[in-house]
Amino acid sequence: MFFKRVGQSKAPQRSVLLALSLVVPSLFLSACMSSEKDIDLSKYVDQTEPADVLYNQGLANLNAGRLDEASKKFDAVDRQHPYSEWARKSMVMGAFADYRKGSYDEAISSAKRYLALYPSTDDAPYAQYIIGLSYYRQIKDVTQDQKEARQTLQTMQDLVTRWPTSEYVDDAKEKIRFANDQLAGKEMQIGRYYLERREYIAAVKRFRTVVENYSNTRHVEEALARLTESYYAMGLTSEAQTAAAVLGTNYPDSPWYKDSYKLLQSNGLSPRENAGSWISKAGKLITGA
């Protein structure tokens, strides 16, 4: 009987304690809420402004050189008025603002997003142009990797192909020429490295790439002279003579031709083109820089 009475007396005590544990925090929270009832919660909520107002504020900031503020305004249009005409315009202008700031990765990302959503709009070639410019601005000298030059080339070629009448085509072609020149310069840099170490086969491969793939760049003259030098060192005199002949035909006043001619003359040889050589065939495509 004693144990039974004890067991019965603990249950009500536990119920009272549980009730108190629920009531006390509630009273505390109510007190806190009543003491802070004047807090302005509106500052935690986006202040929605008309899309055209935000967009024009973005343009004004952009024209004034306040690029961070411009980006914020264009982003606000996209966030507060998604899928509206103003949001579409803000997306491409936001990409341009990022480009102006030098935030090239962000500019590329925004412009690519624009093209994915609006590939057929009037601003689509402009978005493509921004992507190309963002890659172009990151091109490094020829001693370093030329990934950005390849990306510039591809992006600008796509622009010229897809929008041939666009106002951006002329500048895109200039960027294409520059990117090609960079890529040719990289091949020459590697080719010279191999030539200095008398690794002639590897050197020829690089110089051949320049002649065949970058025939309209300023590096073709030197590439033909280096081919003359490499083939001559390998004992392939017919190829050496052909390289010199093609060089002389296209660049008769070139110092590189004079050096190649002198090299052949040192062994009683002269430039003579072999029509069956790959060099002769590639030479017909040379247009000069």
Swiss-Prot record:
Q: List where in the cell it is found.
A: Cell outer membrane
Q: Does the keyword Heme apply?
A: no
Q: Which family does it belong to?
A: Belongs to the BamD family.
| Alphabetical GO biological process terms | Gram-negative-bacterium-type cell outer membrane assembly; protein insertion into membrane
Membrane topology of the entry = Lipid-anchor
Annotated Pfam families:
YfiO
Q: What is its main location?
A: membrane
Q: Which UniProt keywords apply?
A: Cell outer membrane, Lipoprotein, Membrane, Palmitate, Repeat, Signal, TPR repeat
Each TPR repeat, start to end: 51-84, 87-121, 184-217
HAMAP family on file: OM_assembly_BamD
PROSITE patterns in the cross-refs: PROKAR_LIPOPROTEIN, TPR_REGION
The name of this protein is Outer membrane protein assembly factor BamD
Positions with an attached lipid (N-palmitoyl cysteine) read: C32
GO CC: one term? Bam protein complex
Q: What does this protein do?
A: Part of the outer membrane protein assembly complex, which is involved in assembly and insertion of beta-barrel proteins into the outer membrane.
InterPro entries linked: BamD (IPR017689), BamD-like (IPR039565), TPR-like_helical_dom_sf (IPR011990)
Q: Tell me the subunit arrangement.
A: Part of the Bam complex.
Organism superkingdom: Bacteria
Lipidated residue numbers (S-diacylglycerol cysteine): C32
Its signal peptide is: 1-31
